[in-house]
From Swiss-Prot:
Changing residue 1540 to N: Kinase-dead mutation leading to growth retardation with hyper-accumulation of starch and lost photosynthesis-induced phosphorylation. This is RAF-like serine/threonine-protein kinase PRAF. The active site is at residue 1518. PROSITE patterns: PB1, PROTEIN_KINASE_ATP, PROTEIN_KINASE_DOM, PROTEIN_KINASE_ST. It is found in: Cytoplasm.
Length: 1680
């Protein structure tokens, strides 16, 4: 009963020590129907005491206990502080509140009861009366909610405060200290955080007891010091420690900005050892972090040992499971698998299937007593769950007991650990369902639960009747099984919990007859009723044995069923019965729960099934049967067969496991086969883990799964994984005999058994249409699996059904979402055993292979020839015309770069054509020309493992369908095309796929010229790329569906990456990459656009890194009616003798335009284009719907404009040298040079070609020119990359200047590289213009608005040639010295004392050869950053030092020189010493007064000095009183000089990037808001306005404000220093204009100087008059 209102009446307590009248209180509960307590008699004196609230400090309050006629005394503190007490005489008017300080004694009398500590845990607690008895302290102190809310600071009615008696702490407990995945910073996650209050004078023993009473156990008390990390907590273990903590509390309390934070850790556990994750496992740390944040209990240790992967992050303790209990028979041995991730609350927006993996091999025979198993209470937390299924008790098992009985006697019981994938609705039941009396009782017990949860489930969620059906063991309708919509939340590698979009509707392709699909939610009895063959349960529920040698983890939502078995020994393998093992697996395969729930084909009429299949194809051409589970193929095929899920939701659970390794299959005659998909050096680009390839194993490798593209913006490598990596296979057609066995065995009279027992595997090239929810493109193997299944099903009906279904073959091969990286191992001598049917007749198999291959090749030949026959005559005419035109000069020259399509790949492997067919000969020739390196070994094209130090694990390039190698950005550096020159953004470089490579486990070194190429094409031979040949754009607008590489026409890709280009973030996100780009040929054949690269239909597809774009062989352009944009650009060789004889340099001497080039030799648009404007070409390229299209400059230099000045070799000589090698037209090379063609093609999202180059790989030239390239091209990389922001084709030629000449031209122009970059970007000036001798032309085009940023003085002495002539080159120190900068030896300096330390260095007063100087030691952190940034900052320092050395002004501190040999290699500046130090020091001296006249003089000096500096284009960036040095020795004329100029630009970079607290009040808004493009010299004017205020008041601005408030106020123009009322109006006006928010409003220093002169002149007469008055104190007397 809840007491609504109580009347407390006093009663005199007799006795009580020293005759003190205490107040006993009797509760008279009103408004209670069943209770009425007697009121006690009350004396008048006591009544008056209560009415007048005259309770003394010795008065003790007591009260009556409920249900007691006499009443028993209890403490008045059972009432909350401030409780209303009514007087019995007038209960409505006479009221008072319980005094807050009741019981606090102010005397030393021991008899006085001090209740302050007892009340500390009970104040403000809402005390409820439980059964009429006031709850004791121990019960109420269990929750931290009642633990010590502090009211000591709340004044009582008399206004008295007690602020010092109690202290407040922010206390955290129950959580863990874990590193945050994003930055590895330690954070306290999980648990609870409360504000607690304790007495200030509490001792450690009392504090420990209070903690034990409040929290129920002993805790270690630790606290965090300010500015310390969580790994440096201070432990409180004594009274002295507690006193120190109180002192730290006082310090923080005085500041008021933060509160001391304390942590409670269990006494038996150490925080550093238990809570801080020091395992080093990133994934484990991330998962623990997520678990802790989401309130999930401690993760059980993941381990990968003995073939078992602990895939669960939740311990069994959380779930209340006792796996070691004998009644369950689940002994936790070394093969135990931790429980799957489960949580406590049901959420309909999350997954349906919660897998629970547990050993079933250890199940005992007697499971019937499981109903007697005790039910363990749930210990799950109450915080929001990570996943959404509830398992309160014992581990549920699927189905009834008798259905598991046969597991003991199974022939597989000795195999080893076997695991069960459990459906979510089974896992949803709690312990009562299995620990109670049976299924019926479980249903009744959960009736209320399902009533409540069904209401909030969603229509697609499993209702209660589905739960009931699991126990009633009757068929479940398809409506109950088709569960869709809710998905598992994805946990990215950085711990973000993301919710996937819901797809409640089934895809059209998923509507299958319910009788064809058993569901994973069916009990085993159901499955056996459908499939009487009694398939062993573990065959349908085992997960796959994962690779134990991989440091990878499976995500729980991928713990789906599979027929793969764990690894077993050879003896165990011999005990298998293959026919029984593989029997009916296809028919009994389990469908997956998710957006598509199609079941396996069951036993029945095969004609009807084939007819149904054809009907589905007619309705949906993209339909493929979802009935084929992964285990159905894994048992018979070593390569994993899997079903593609076209149109399914992104988060639908997929068949997660692949194939059973061949060594796990029964023995028998073996067929030789090899599976090579990744080179030995492949590095998982998702997480940088190296995938181990073991040639003697056939196991899979798995990688960490992650979120779909739309939710992976937080991942460090999301950009790489979001792009489709379209692997274009160039493998010749050959077959691998793969036994499919009885799993696809359907007896028919029309199909030979051999035709479906052994399925041919033609290596048909697959163009993977991009699935927007696909993380990694599946391997070529995965798509072949679907093709085999599809073709096999077609063959089960009629023979002609195979032909009828082939037209849909390409459209149905949709990419499957895979959550791990496919990586088949080379198996060496081990291979897949042949099906027993053919163990005695391998000759039949070989014969059948030959026949089948002939049919396939004939079909491919007809298709290809039929497609190219339409334009045969036109193509031949165009090709012959071009060949004859370039016959003399281009015969045998490198055939150019061409990206293959399906025509190339198919026709290149068709074998010999009829000799009389010119078309076929020409076709083969074109293929050979397109792939001059088709016979290169895998060790060259991707199989090579680059040195670890040169491998970027996040960048990979796929070569063919089986070769992957890390991209080495050092090898592929293209004239510094690295996005700002940082060398980090060379994201994509795709080696051309090479046709003709065989899949072999070992490579035999070729002979002849191929051996020469093998020997020379080693990594050391890679050269910096120096040549760009030609760019071709295909714009055929017609899409021929059957020419798309098996990608359906309706495939689209959602935007994958943020609107920021990978090249340093400088490109705009207009549109996605443009497909259909090919690199045109320079000789031999022309390139026609492929019909499968229609721009409008492919604009929505992302061309990812390493992508190879499909394009067909071309033999003419105008005949096709298409337009081509040929942009002929060439990066000329550097003007250096080392490059003069290179192949790239020689090749650039000829014009490469062949097909109506866009520009002519004069640099203008070609007039033969029939008036087509450049914008029309742009529309052809990008389409009409591209927003904000930026047109390039109309003047684009052609190849003739950019010819190298040093080369005169003819192409005929080059061709001749190539012929000597015996390669003819396939490859141009001589005995000394081997040129490897590398295409570094990267399409930014606006369609611009950022990187498209040819790489010369002359080893000798590369080694000799390394230094020249690094200096010249590396420094200009950012310039090259920055062109792309304004130009569609940022393909300007590289400068032909040597390094020294390049520096000279910049210096002559008075420009820095940054200024030149900005100039290049803004007005499109080409590099060729830079090489002009007349540098005045270049200097005149500098953007005038940005001249303020030019830090270099234009009045430097004209001795730049001195530096170049002396061979100093680009050394900034040497150049500065040559220009007259004085260097001072550190040994000549003597440091006397430290004057001060700042952000950028420490200043000392010292002596330099007897002269007083100021020595500023610059901190090394000022030059921190990437190597390129460090180099640039150092160059800026020397350049500015040189300029400062030439500054001479009386109001600028003299700059004497630079110290280059400081301690530790640090730099220092030596300047003039000012005896009085800085103006700030003068203002801080209270005994020194600065009158108005002196203020004006100091301000005038500072303005004069700044006017001089701005006239020299030098911006100070840090103008404040601290940097204004003064000499106050002359009382009549103080001197002020501007100092601290040595690092103006370095300061700017530091302050803008980080924001320096000591400089914030003087920083202009444009500096604080981060928009550096608005920075001008007016930032110094703003600072000068603040300096004027300092001079006026002598105080520091905003000295008591938080820096965040300062920044916000300045930027928002709401914060400026308060101007005193006595300020002179002229001074006020000038000061306010100086700190105006808009830079344009601020005056220049010239104007400031004028106004200050005016004010000084106006002040001069007054000063003279005062002086005259002082000299004639009695003027009237003089008059008399």
């Amino acid at each position: 009963m809840v007491v609504r209102e109580a009347m407390i009446v006093p009663q005199t307590v007799q006795g009580g020590g020293k005759g003190v009248n205490g107040c006993s209180l009797v509760s008279n509960y009103q408004n209670s129907r069943d209770l009425c307590l007697q009121s006690a008699a009350m004396e008048q004196k006591s009544k008056g005491v209560i009415e007048n609230c005259n309770l003394g400090p010795h008065d003790v309050g007591v009260g009556w206990k409920r249900n007691s006629s006499e009443g028993s005394i209890s403490s008045m503190d059972s009432l909350p502080c401030g409780e209303t007490v009514f007087s019995p005489s007038d209960p409505h008017n006479s009221v008072f509140r319980k005094p807050r300080r009741l019981g606090v004694s102010e005397s030393d009398d021991e008899s006085v009861i001090d209740q302050s500590q007892e009340e500390s845990l009970l104040r403000k607690s809402k005390r409820s009366v439980m059964g009429g008895t006031v709850q004791p302290h121990s019960a109420m102190a269990q929750s931290v909610d009642e633990a010590a809310p502090d009211h000591s600071s709340t004044p009582s009615d008399d206004g008295k405060d007690f602020p010092s008696s109690r202290v407040k702490f922010m206390c955290s407990f129950g959580g863990k200290i874990l590193p945050r995945p994003s930055d590895q910073q330690l954070r306290y996650v999980g648990g609870q955080t409360r504000i607690i209050g304790i007495n200030r004078d509490v001792n450690f023993s009392e504090l420990r007891n209070k903690m034990r009473e409040s929290f129920g156990q002993c805790y270690t008390f630790k606290y965090q010091l300010p500015d310390e990390d969580l790994d440096a907590l201070v432990t409180v273990s004594s009274d002295e420690d507690l006193e120190n903590m109180m002192e730290e509390y006082d310090k923080l309390e005085a500041d008021g900005s933060s509160r001391l934070r304390v942590f409670l850790f269990p006494a038996d556990q150490d925080a550093t050892s238990f809570d801080i994750d020091s395992t080093g496992d990133l994934r484990n740390s991330e998962q623990r972090y997520v678990d802790a944040v989401n309130g999930i209990a401690e993760s059980s240790t993941r381990r990968i040992s003995d073939g078992v992967l602990g895939a669960s992050p939740v311990s069994s303790d959380l779930l209340g499971l006792e796996l070691s209990e004998p009644s369950w028979g689940l002994a936790r041995g070394p093969d135990a698998v931790p429980m799957a991730m489960l949580a406590t609350h049901h959420d309909p927006n999350l997954i349906h299937q919660v897998p629970v993996a547990h050993p079933v091999s250890a199940l005992t025979g007697n499971l019937s007593n499981r109903s007697n198993a005790p039910s363990a209470p749930s210990s799950a937390p109450s915080s929001p769950p990570l996943l959404a299924r509830n398992l309160h008790g014992k581990l549920p098992l699927v189905g009834e007991l008798h259905q598991f009985q046969y597991l003991q006697d199974s022939q597989f019981k000795g195999v080893g650990p076997q695991y069960t994938g459990m459906p979510s609705e089974v896992a949803h039941q709690d312990s009562e369902s299995y620990g109670g009396s049976g299924g019926s009782s479980a249903a009744s017990q959960h009736e209320m639960h399902y009533r409540s949860t069904d209401s909030r489930r969603g229509p697609e969620s499993p209702p209660k009747k589905f739960h009931d059906a699991l126990h009633q063991d009757h068929p479940i309708t398809v409506e109950q099984r088709r569960l869709s919509g809710t998905k598992m939340p994805r946990i990215g590698s950085h711990g973000k919990l993301t919710r996937l979009s819901e797809h409640s509707e089934l895809a059209p392709s998923s509507r299958v007859d319910s009788q064809q699909m058993p569901d994973i939610h069916m009990a085993p009895g159901e499955l056996q009723r459908l499939f009487p063959q009694q398939v062993p349960l573990q065959q349908t529920l085992w997960p796959h044995a994962m690779d134990t040698q991989q440091d990878s983890y499976r995500r729980p939502d991928m713990l789906q069923s599979s027929g793969a078995q764990p690894a077993v020994s050879g003896q165990q393998q011999q005990g298998y019965q293959p026919q029984q093992q593989l029997q009916h697996l296809f028919r009994s395969g389990l469908s997956q729960t998710g957006a598509n729930h199609e079941g396996a084909y069951r036993q029945g009429d095969q004609q009807q099934q084939s007819q149904q299949f054809q009907e589905d194809l007619h309705v949906n051409p993209n339909y493929i049967p979802r009935s084929v589970s992964s285990h159905a193929i894994a048992a018979g095929i070593a390569a994993g067969q899997s079903t593609s899920y076209h149109g399914s939701a992104p988060s639908s659970p997929r068949p997660g496991f692949r194939e059973l390794p061949s060594r796990h299959l029964p023995g028998g005659p073996q067929l030789q086969h090899q599976w090579t998909f990744n080179g030995a050096g492949y590095v998982d680009q998702g997480f940088g883990r190296r995938v181990m390839n073991y040639p003697d194993q056939a196991t899979r490798s798995f990688r960490l799964s992650s979120s779909p593209p739309r939710y992976r913006d937080h991942h460090p490598h999301s950009e790489e994984r979001l792009h489709r990596q379209a692997q274009q296979v160039s493998e010749p057609l050959h077959h691998e005999q793969v036994p499919v066995s009885g799993q696809l065995k359907f007896e028919t009279n029309s199909v030979s058994q051999a035709q479906y027992d052994l399925v041919p595997r033609p290596q048909v090239p697959q163009y993977k249409g991009h699935n927007p929810f696909q993380e990694k493109i599946t391997s070529f193997q995965d798509h072949q699996e679907v093709g085999d299944i599809r073709r096999h099903v077609l063959q089960q009906g009629k023979d002609n059904q195979l032909l009828a279904g082939q037209q849909h073959l390409h459209s149905i091969l949709q990419p499957q979402r895979i959550d791990y990286q496919e990586s088949l191992k080379q198996q060496g001598d081990q291979s897949i055993p042949i099906h027993p049917r053919f163990q005695d007749g391998q000759e039949k198999v070989a014969e059948w292979m030959v026949q089948e291959r002939a049919l396939e090749e004939e079909e491919a030949r007809k298709r290809v020839l039929g497609r190219i026959r339409q334009a045969e005559l036109e193509e031949e005419a165009a090709a012959e015309a071009v060949v004859s035109q370039h016959k003399d000069t281009h015969q045998g020259v490198y055939a150019g770069l061409h990206l293959p399509n399906d025509e190339d790949l198919l026709t290149s492997s068709l074998g010999d054509y009829p000799s009389g067919n010119r078309r076929n000969e020409r076709l083969e020739s074109s293929i050979s020309n397109a792939f001059p390196f088709r016979h290169l070994p895998p060790s060259v094209l991707g199989g090579y493992t680059a040195p670890k130090s040169r491998v970027n694990p996040t960048e990979t390039s796929h070569v063919a369908q089986y070769v992957s190698r890390p991209v080495d950005t050092d090898y592929l550096a293209v004239a510094g095309l690295r996005g700002g020159g940082n060398g980090q953004d060379m994201r994509s470089a795709a080696l051309f796929e090479v046709n003709g490579l065989q899949q072999t486990s070992g490579y035999q070194m070729p002979s002849g010229p191929h051996r020469l190429m093998e020997e020379r094409l080693m990594p050391s031979a890679f050269n910096p790329i120096t040549q760009l040949q030609k760019l071709r754009i295909n714009d055929n607008l017609a899409l021929n569906n059957d020419m798309r590489w098996s990608g359906s026409e309706d495939v689209r890709n959602e935007p994958s990456i943020p609107a920021r280009d990978r090249m340093g973030g400088i490109y705009e996100d207009h549109h996605q990459g443009l497909p259909g780009l090919t690199l045109g040929r320079s000789a031999g054949k022309l390139s026609r656009p492929s019909s499968n690269t229609s721009i409008p239909n492919l604009l929505d597809e992302t061309i990812g890194e390493g992508s190879l774009l499909p394009s067909g062989p071309s033999y003419g352009t105008q005949a096709q009616g298409t337009n081509l944009i040929d942009i002929t650009q060439s990066i000329s060789a550097i003007d250096n003798p080392l490059y003069s004889t290179s192949y790239a340099s020689r090749l650039s001497n000829t014009s490469l335009g062949l097909d109506s080039p866009l520009v002519t030799s004069g640099g203008m648009l070609n007039s033969s284009l029939e008036g087509t404007s450049f914008s029309d070409y742009y529309k052809i390229k990008m389409g009409d719907d591209l927003p904000n299209a930026k047109m390039p400059s109309s003047k684009i230099p052609s190849a003739e404009d950019n010819l190298s000045r040093s080369s005169s070799s003819s192409l005929s000589e080059l061709s001749k040298s190539g012929s000597e090698d015996g390669l003819g037209g396939q490859l141009t090379m001589d005995q000394r040079t081997v040129d490897m063609v590398v295409a570094a093609l990267d399409l930014d999202r606006s369609g611009s070609v950022v990187q498209s180059v040819l790489e010369s790989s002359d080893a000798k030239e590369a080694s000799l020119s390394e230094s020249v390239h690094d200096h010249s091209l590396g420094k200009l990389g950012s310039v090259v990359g920055s062109v792309g922001t304004q130009s569609v084709w940022p393909l300007d030629s590289a400068p032909t200047l040597a390094a020294g000449l390049w520096e000279k031209k910049l210096d002559e122009a008075g420009m820095t590289e940054e200024t030149f970059e900005r100039h290049i970007t803004s007005d499109g000036t080409t590099f060729e213009e830079l090489t002009a001798d007349d540098h005045e032309v270049l200097a005149s085009t500098v953007d005038k608005e940005n001249q303020e940023e030019v830090r270099t003085g234009l009045d430097e002495p004209a001795d730049e040639d001195k530096a170049n002539s002396t061979g100093l080159g680009s050394d900034p120190a040497a150049k500065a010295i040559a220009r007259g900068l004085q260097t001072i030896k550190n040994a000549d300096l003597e440091e006397l004392r430290e004057l001060g330390s700042g952000t950028f260095g420490t200043v000392y007063h010292g002596k330099w050869r007897g002269t007083d100087v100021a020595i500023k030691r610059i901190k090394a952190s000022c030059f921190a950053g990437r190597p390129s940034e460090q180099e640039r900052l150092i160059e800026d320092f020397w350049r500015e030092a040189c300029n400062l050395g030439h500054l001479h002004h009386p109001n600028v501190v003299a700059f004497y020189g630079v110290v280059a040999d400081g301690p530790g290699g640090t730099l220092a500046t030596v300047t003039e010493y000012m005896v009085n130090g800085s103006l700030k020091q003068v203002l801080q001296k209270k005994d020194r007064t600065i009158d108005r006249r002196k203020r004006l003089l100091i301000a005038m000096d500072a303005a004069f000095g700044m006017e001089y500096l701005h006239g020299k284009n030098i911006v100070h960036f840090d103008l404040k009183c601290e940097n204004l040095l003064v000499n106050m020795r002359d009382p009549h004329r103080p001197i002020c000089k501007v100092g601290d100029l040595g690092l103006s630009k370095v300061k700017h970079q530091t302050m803008v990037s980080g924001g320096v607290r000591g400089t914030l009040p003087w920083m202009a808004p444009e500096l604080l808001n981060g928009n550096s493009s608005l920075v001008t010299e007016k930032v110094d004017v703003f600072s000068f306005g603040i300096v004027m205020w300092e001079l006026l008041t002598g105080e520091e601005p905003y000295d008591k404000m938080h820096y965040g408030a300062i920044i916000g106020g300045i930027v928002n123009n709401t914060l400026r220093p308060l101007i005193p009322s006595w300020c002179d109006p002229a001074w006020r006006s000038l000061m306010e204009r100086c700190w105006a928010n808009e830079p344009a409003v601020r005056p220049s220093f010239s104007d400031i100087a004028k106004e200050l002169r005016t004010m000084a002149a106006a002040l001069q007469p007054k000063t003279q008059a005062q002086t005259q008055g002082q000299s004639h104190p009695h003027p009237q007397m003089q008059i008399v």
